[in-house]
Amino acid sequence: MRLIFAGTPEPAVVVLSRLLESEHEVVAVLTRPDARRGRGRTLHPSPVSELAQQHGIEVLTPATIKPNTPDGDAFRARLTELAPDCVPVVAYGNLITEDLLQAVPHGWINLHFSLLPRWRGAAPVQAAIAAGDTSTGATTFRIDKGLDTGQILGVIHEPIQSTDTADDLLTRLAYSGADLLVNTMDNLAQGIATYSEQIGTATYAPKITTEDARIQWTHPAEAVDKHIRAVTPGPGAWSLLGDQRFKIGPVSVAEESDLQPGHMRIEKNRVLVGTGDLNIELDQIQPQGKKRMKASDWARGLQNTEGLVLS
């Protein structure tokens, strides 16, 4: 089939790479415009844009795809000219309007990193880890006008390990999900795809803000650990020590329970922090404006280790 691939971040690159190895023809990619990154705030293309350029594939970067806008109208004209059979989508980042959904024979097919209808929304991997789910997966579905409510075309399952960060889990899902999406494209091309309605209670995973990533030390140690892993590497779990922000993680749950929530104790090679029940041991810490380091190395540089409280 002729495809326009819609995606933006690194996990989408894994999927695009797999599509480029398949029998399908990627005639263009649709991705977010170049964004400013780094200390110099210089413009950089999205990861998907970079891969497409390496393969000589046309890159479409409208600021919006809404109708009756210059960018949106130009995209619609190019969509008609390219005449794709299907538009596979992986974390594109823009709302797809209903007229566009109906403009492609096989529609816009999304690869979503959860077992729908559980964890609809922008942060399904993070939500699964934070909730303590022991398994998750990926779903391909035809996008409709709802939020991740469309008919399902395929699923794969993935166990969640007790040490998984969001990055660990998303990396595995990107690779297994890439195979799922190619299989879905194959089935659509061969006319053997089957659609099924989503069954079960829907739960939601909204985008995680920096404030959401702040550690609540009054929560139980296991919940603190899950929270930290869920927001690693981005936006990154953090806490304040005085007026300085520290990024924290990974951590491990200790056996002791003698510290009050947020209170720290420095031992020879350990940095312990109290939670709502057991203490946790910090493995790594990143002071504001500095590189990540071992928590024990950071502690050795302190002049005063008494009365330290994270909040």
Swiss-Prot record:
Name the record gives this protein: Methionyl-tRNA formyltransferase
EC nos: 2.1.2.9
NCBIfam families to which the protein is assigned, alphabetical: fmt
Keyword Transcription regulation among UniProt keywords: no
Keywords: Protein biosynthesis, Transferase
Sites where the protein binds (6S)-5,6,7,8-tetrahydrofolate: 114-117
HAMAP family: Formyl_trans
Catalytic activity from the UniProt record: L-methionyl-tRNA(fMet) + (6R)-10-formyltetrahydrofolate = N-formyl-L-methionyl-tRNA(fMet) + (6S)-5,6,7,8-tetrahydrofolate + H(+)
Function: Attaches a formyl group to the free amino group of methionyl-tRNA(fMet). The formyl group appears to play a dual role in the initiator identity of N-formylmethionyl-tRNA by promoting its recognition by IF2 and preventing the misappropriation of this tRNA by the elongation apparatus.
Gene3D superfamilies documented for this protein: 3.40.50.12230
GO MF entries: methionyl-tRNA formyltransferase activity
Recorded family membership: Belongs to the Fmt family.
Native organism: Corynebacterium diphtheriae (strain ATCC 700971 / NCTC 13129 / Biotype gravis)
